[in-house]
Regions:
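Non-heme Fe(II) oxygenase catalytic core, chiefly the N-lobe of the double-stranded beta-helix
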Residues: 1-126
Length: 126
């Protein structure tokens, strides 16, 4: 496994760890990395919605977004799509996902399908 630190404060890119492996041993590695680096990135992990949900369940009960409808067969997964000419800025301003809950979410899994060469940034804070 290779760990590349992305900044002095938080964030690491992880190579050599398969997110399809839902074993307790693999999850422990992922969870330990998350606790240490706060935000972790995995490239080219072509996981299915079922595999994404299985990974998420290791962190605790899955939640459905209160305001945004999830996917038809996967209500815990919200798909964010922006068309080329669309002017709306979904989540444009600084926010913390579902931080309004009495018990805030422990973790959020973002899976990027197509990332534009410019813009589309997601910022993180600890």
């Amino acid at each position: 496994m290779e760990i590349k630190l992305l900044s002095g404060a938080l964030g690491a890119e992880i190579k050599g760890l398969d997110l399809k492996d839902t074993s307790e041993e693999n999850f422990k590695k992922i969870n330990d990395l998350l606790l240490e680096h706060k935000v972790i990135f995995f490239r080219n992990q072509n996981i299915t919605p079922e595999e994404q949900l299985a990974l998420g369940k290791h962190f605790g009960p899955l939640e459905k977004h209160v305001y945004v409808k999830g996917r038809e067969n996967y209500p815990e997964i919200v798909r964010i799509i922006k068309k080329p000419n669309e002017k709306n800025q979904w989540g444009e301003n600084w926010h913390s996902d579902v931080s309004y809950n009495a018990k805030p979410t422990k973790a959020v899994i973002l899976k990027s399908i197509k990332i534009p060469p410019v813009g589309g940034d997601t910022c993180f804070s600890n």
